[in-house]
Amino acid sequence: ALTYREMAERDSTHLNFILQYISECYSQMKDTENYVNTLREGFTRYPSFPFFYPRLIEYYQNCNMNDSAMAVTDKALKTDSTNINFMLTKSTLLLNRGDYAESLYYCYNILQKDSTVADTYYNIGLIYFNQAIEIDKVRQTSAAKKRQMENLYRQSLPYLEKYRAMAPEKKQRW
């Protein structure tokens, strides 16, 4: 299939699918460098095509290249700031690096657009839960900090319960 790559790429009408097939060939051949380069090219040319973005993000996260994942997500949001998948990924990346307020901002924007996105509830629950854990890690906490911690745990609970009800098959998360 790769033998005819140059000829196939001249078909601009179907180039998004051609780049998808080329990247899949590289993946099957375990040629990571060309696989990722083709994903990047595909995403650059077709940011809203559903194949390239999630695979690029998955690759970057598997390689612990979170800054690259964030950069791709920021580019994606510039092309479509209302795309729930892009917003959820941004929220998750922010959550993972501890930017809770900004992550929460994206979560609430998602819920305004679509309240059926289960992972949004999961992220909100984790935002509150993780903040409580951070307080709990401190050996000597004041009574006020303990109350704050308990309040954060309480705040997380309805979101995590909602996630559990919406995604009962994802037991490893709850």
Where are these regions (language model features)?
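Canonical positions in the second alpha-helix
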Residues: M7-A8, E41-G42, K75-A76, N109-I110, ...
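Structural marker of alpha-solenoid helical repeat scaffolds
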Residues: R10-D11, R45, T79, K113, ...
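Residue-level recognition of tetratricopeptide repeat
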Residues: H14-L15, F49, N83, V117, ...
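Short coil/turn linking the two alpha-helices of tandem helical-hairpin repeats
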Residues: M29-K30, N62-N64, N96-G98, G125, ...
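Short coil/linker segments at helix-helix boundaries
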Residues: F129-K162
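Structural register within alpha-helical repeat arrays
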Residues: Y21-I22, R55-L56, K90, I124, ...
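Canonical tetratricopeptide repeat
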Residues: I18-L19, F52-Y53, M87, Y121, ...
